[in-house]
């Protein structure tokens, strides 16, 4: 059998077939590229050189090249994961619960409107952690949650401030993909609670904004409702159009409070 670059390409693709790797063949340059689907990092193999080795060593030449490529790609993946951070992200409760059939994401309940997912972030790539990835990382769900919350506390914050009709609104919008995640930083929420004189209202209309408001009158509630709806409609990754009253570590959706107010008002009038 005469070995050609095209035949060698087919042989290597058979040896290196893995669901997390992609192949790209440049027939003009006779180069086969094998790369990781997530990071796009990979190895280029010049096929004429492998064919020349095959003429001398036959199958052993293919085995050696396949081994080299496999080890290099696995090393790249380990290096990438060791540099990666696990961070929590806030999503709507309507967000998919599975990456695909039979492969659920790692999740934690948060509020009636929001759920916590976990992202493996290496700056260049960002992937929500599902059960299969969890196994590859060699971590438990509890370890992922603890690491994520620890890293969330290290995220910086600097608010812009605006006052309307006596109500003060604080906006966080760094566009780092984790603005809404700051809602999980309990020490941040407590420090804001101390400086707020009225009701503390918190909103995460989309991934790239956190709003904390000091609401002292009904106008303030109207403003935060309109503001949250506007941000929700404009967000690249919308979360919820509802805002929450924050008290003693709990988030109460405002529409529930409004319903309770109406019931109370009705009883008083009766």
Swiss-Prot record:
It holds the Pfam family DUF1444. InterPro entries: DUF1444. It comes from the Bacteria. Belongs to the UPF0354 family. This is UPF0354 protein BCAH820_4810.
């Amino acid at each position: 059998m005469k070995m050609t670059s095209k035949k060698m390409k087919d042989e290597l693709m058979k040896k290196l077939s893995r669901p997390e790797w992609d192949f790209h063949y440049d027939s003009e340059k006779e180069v086969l590229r094998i790369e990781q689907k997530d990071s796009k990092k990979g190895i280029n193999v010049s096929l004429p050189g492998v064919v020349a080795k095959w003429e001398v060593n036959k199958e052993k030449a293919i085995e050696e090249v396949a081994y080299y490529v496999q080890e290099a790609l696995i090393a790249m993946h380990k290096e990438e994961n060791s540099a990666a951070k696990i961070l929590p992200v806030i999503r709507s409760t309507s967000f998919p619960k599975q990456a695909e059939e039979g492969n659920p994401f790692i999740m934690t309940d948060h509020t009636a409107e929001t759920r916590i997912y976990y992202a493996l972030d290496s700056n260049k790539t960002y992937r929500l952690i599902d059960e299969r990835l969890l196994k590859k990382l060699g971590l438990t769900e509890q370890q992922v949650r603890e690491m994520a919350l620890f890293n969330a506390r290290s995220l910086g914050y600097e608010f812009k401030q605006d006052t309307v009709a006596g109500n003060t609104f604080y906006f966080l919008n760094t566009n780092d993909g984790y603005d809404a995640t700051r809602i999980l930083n309990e020490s941040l929420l407590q420090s804001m609670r101390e400086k707020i004189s009225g009701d503390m209202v918190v909103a995460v209309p989309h991934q790239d904004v956190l709003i904390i408001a000091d609401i002292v009158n009904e106008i303030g509630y109207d403003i935060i409702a309109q503001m949250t709806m506007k941000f929700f409609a404009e967000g690249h990754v919308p979360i919820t159009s509802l805002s929450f009253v924050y008290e003693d570590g709990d988030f109460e959706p405002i529409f529930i409070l409004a319903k309770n107010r109406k019931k109370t008002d009705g009883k008083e009038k009766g």
